[in-house]
């Protein structure tokens, strides 16, 4: 397959000399900089981020515009820094977020970068980039390299009061790095590992005056993939210019450019258990099925997609942020942005096993042999243009003689999304062998072209306000409100170009949401809180895929949460604990073969906790766990399926992480660390007839400090080589996504 950056048959292969250069050059570069700074880095932990440590007094931007600390935010906010992610070997934002309480991630190439939070998933989760919403996660999200990020912040639970429609289960904010004034620095990363996986990155922070600095981060990745021939690759360039202008004005101009190619691995097909014996037997420990389905051993790590697959995207996002401290009590903030993305998929996505006694034909009218894997063809081309602006003011003052801070503002955006798609007239395009697939080419099939076009326009204008009132020295009342004027228009065109009035529609919606929270600092180190918050989101359909009758009104969710945040006085340990209940109503349900209504519901209860502890010098321990009980109320995802009382797909009841790190073992420049992760059983479909087995993975790393700021890492991922199902995409009911097997990597990281 031709690379989309060059004619190289392996995209991004040029990352290899780039990475090799970093490996060879970094020690020499640092020998003249880091060595000269030895006196400033004698503390052995100076260059080492403390895994999982979350000082409760630092701000939590994703949780509020009020500038509240983690301690004073009446919600659960979790953060993982770039340094922690890279130390643990998490090179993507999804892998890093998985280390936070209660979060799992997954998705197929058609719906990449999905998250599960508090019993909700897919478009019920809002993913932000530097605080900006770019569309439903299943349509617009792409894996992000963690090298380019400052941190990942997660707000658990409904958050429409802050970010508008869609934020029911929570918000994941992937935040880019900011320039630092007055300090010249550079960061290097070079990594090679199993499956011919390369990662490389370079970041430079350069002051250009006393009041201005520029930062540029560039990262590249390339891999054959743990499923051979899946070939994921990416190039991510992020940069920012920071200027402290006169008159107490700060300007930040940012740019994010991404070109990527997603993995071509759409899944491993399910087969009748009785047929698996002809293909190496059943691969045990992966799933159980009430309808007699299993995974055949011969299908493990097979790629059934076409060789000339397409899963590429190019995106561009410039941003401008202005902060003006007009007076000692009044600050004005403005953020403007533009976003463009072009995405292309052209693949064989669905794989169906043809059991004995079945008559099936391909698109050419040929009989498909039983025991084969029948494939479809599907192409989707997307173009997205979006502009937006947020303007708000923060005022510090008093209310009824009590200390008070209020934020009020306006948020506006316009999004134009054009989706072209096509597929053959026949149910199956062709077929391949289960155990030794000849992947073939995409080809041409009757009915695939011309494309069916569906442009969508989404406009949003919102008024919002937040307030924190200090009722006493230890008691704070935190409130918020947001009113949206949301306009959605979707035009569908038939293959012949004629307008489809039956499915096209337009509508106006007026969601309004709020938050009320009470925060009590019981002692200097112990805080208790309780809160209520709400959210609105599309009732069942993707906002870019909704047709007439599927979007008459928004669904509505409410959450009640209580929690505790505490730390030891000496700062050696901190703990957060929360319990919540979420109700979501007005979900889209099928009431007949061609009729729907918004009568569905879902509820979720859970407990989450995170603890970080330094039991002794050179030791750090980070642990978290989350228990979730999520169930549908009345819910019929289609006319033939009654999911009432069932678990939502891909939602585990229990998720846990444990990381232990020992730095400078026995006084040597060697660090050792290990992590354990548990993910519980999950439903694999709406009917809850497919159950994905629980799994545990163990990761290990050893680090050798060549210089105070140069570290060589060796890692083993999935040490016990546990085979497991990571994800079941309900859009592809005949297949599941397997998780990565055991892997090894060697990397060099340097900062100077």
Residue ranges and their predicted role:
Residues 105, 116, 132-156, 175, ...:
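Short acidic/polar hinge/loop motifs at secondary-structure boundaries
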Residues 147-150, 156, 161-239, 245-249, ...:
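Outer-membrane beta-barrel translocator/receptor signature
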Residues 4, 677-685, 703-752:
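C-terminal beta-signal and adjacent terminal beta-strands/loops
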Residues 244-246, 384, 403-407, 411-415, ...:
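Structural signature of Gram-negative outer-membrane beta-barrels, strongest in the C-terminal barrel
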Residues 474, 581-583, 598-686, 720, ...:
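Gram-negative outer-membrane beta-barrel transporters
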Residues 318-340, 373-493, 576:
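Face-selective signature of the C-terminal outer-membrane beta-barrel domain
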Residues 221, 225, 238-244, 248-323, ...:
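Acidic/polar loop-and-plug regions of large Gram-negative outer-membrane beta-barrel proteins
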Residues 323-325, 329-337, 341-349, 521, ...:
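Membrane-embedded beta-barrel scaffold of Gram-negative outer-membrane proteins
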């Amino acid at each position: 397959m031709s690379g989309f950056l060059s004619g190289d048959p392996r995209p991004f292969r040029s990352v290899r000399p780039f990475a090799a250069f970093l490996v060879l050059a970094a020690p020499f570069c640092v020998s003249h900089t880091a060595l000269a700074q030895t006196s400033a880095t004698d503390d052995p932990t100076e260059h080492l981020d403390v895994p999982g440590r979350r000082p409760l007094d630092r701000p939590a931007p994703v949780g509020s515009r009020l500038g509240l600390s983690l301690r004073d935010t009446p919600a659960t906010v979790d953060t993982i820094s770039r340094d922690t992610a890279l130390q643990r070997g998490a090179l993507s934002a999804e892998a890093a977020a998985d280390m936070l309480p209660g979060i799992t991630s997954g998705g197929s190439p058609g719906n990449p970068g999905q998250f599960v939070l508090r019993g909700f998933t897919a478009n019920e989760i809002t993913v932000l980039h530097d605080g900006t919403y770019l569309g439903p996660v299943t349509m617009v999200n792409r894996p992000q390299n963690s090298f380019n990020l400052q941190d990942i912040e997660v707000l658990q639970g409904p958050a429409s009061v802050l970010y508008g429609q869609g934020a029911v289960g929570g918000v994941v904010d992937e935040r880019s790095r900011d320039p630092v004034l007055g300090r010249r620095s550079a960061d290097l990363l070079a990594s090679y590992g199993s499956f011919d996986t390369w990662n490389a990155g370079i970041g430079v922070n350069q002051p250009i005056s006393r009041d201005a600095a520029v930062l540029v981060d560039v990262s590249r990745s390339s891999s054959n993939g743990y499923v051979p021939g899946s070939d994921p690759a990416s190039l991510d360039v992020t940069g920012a210019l920071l200027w402290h202008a006169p008159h107490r004005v700060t300007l930040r101009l940012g740019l994010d450019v991404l070109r990527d190619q997603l993995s071509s691995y759409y899944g491993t097909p399910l087969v009748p258990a009785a047929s698996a014996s002809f293909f190496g037997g059943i691969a045990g420990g992966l799933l159980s099925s009430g309808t007699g389905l299993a995974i055949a051993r011969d299908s493990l790590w097979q790629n059934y997609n076409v060789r000339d697959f397409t899963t590429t995207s190019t995106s561009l996002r410039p941003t401008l942020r202005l902060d003006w401290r007009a007076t000692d009590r009044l600050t004005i903030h403005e953020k403007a942005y533009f976003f463009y993305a072009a995405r292309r998929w052209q693949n064989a996505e669905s794989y169906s096993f043809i059991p004995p006694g079945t008559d099936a034909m391909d698109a050419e009218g040929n009989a498909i042999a039983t025991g084969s894997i029948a494939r479809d063809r599907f192409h989707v081309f997307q173009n997205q243009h979006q502009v937006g602006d947020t303007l708000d003011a923060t005022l510090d003052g008093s209310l009824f003689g009590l200390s008070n801070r209020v934020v009020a503002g306006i948020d506006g955006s316009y999004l134009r999304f054009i989706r072209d798609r096509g597929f053959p007239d026949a149910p199956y395009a062709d077929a391949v062998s289960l155990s030794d697939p000849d992947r073939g080419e995409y080809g041409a099939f009757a009915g695939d072209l011309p494309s069916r076009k569906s442009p969508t326009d989404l406009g949003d204008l919102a008024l919002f306000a937040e307030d924190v009132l200090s009722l006493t020295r230890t008691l704070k009342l935190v409130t918020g409100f947001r009113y949206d004027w949301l306009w959605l228009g979707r035009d569908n065109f038939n293959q012949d170009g004629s307008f489809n009035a039956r499915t096209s529609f337009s509508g106006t919606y007026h969601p309004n949401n709020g938050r009320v929270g009470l925060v009590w600092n019981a002692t200097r180190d112990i805080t208790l809180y309780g809160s209520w918050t709400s959210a609105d989101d599309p009732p069942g359909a993707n906002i870019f895929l909704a047709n007439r009758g599927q979007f008459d009104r928004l669904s509505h969710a409410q959450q009640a949460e209580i929690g505790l945040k505490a730390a030891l006085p000496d700062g050696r340990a901190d703990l957060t604990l929360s319990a919540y209940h979420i109700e979501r109503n007005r979900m889209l349900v099928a009431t007949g073969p061609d009729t729907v209504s918004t009568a569905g519901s879902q509820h979720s209860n859970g407990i989450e906790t995170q603890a970080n502890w330094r039991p002794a010098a050179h030791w750090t321990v980070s642990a978290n766990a989350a228990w979730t009980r999520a169930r549908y109320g009345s819910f019929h995802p289609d006319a033939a399926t009654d999911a009432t009382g069932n678990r939502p797909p891909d939602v585990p009841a229990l998720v846990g992480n444990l990381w232990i790190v020992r730095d400078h073992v026995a006084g040597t420049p060697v660090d050792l660390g290990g992590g354990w992760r548990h993910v519980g059983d999950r439903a694999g479909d709406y009917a809850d007839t497919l159950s994905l087995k629980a799994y545990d993975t163990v990761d290990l790393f050893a680090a050798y400090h060549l210089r105070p700021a140069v570290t060589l890492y060796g890692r083993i991922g999935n040490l016990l080589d546990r085979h497991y199902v990571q994800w079941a995409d309900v859009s592809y009911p005949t297949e599941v996504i397997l998780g990565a097997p055991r892997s090894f990597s060697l990397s060099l990281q340097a900062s100077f």
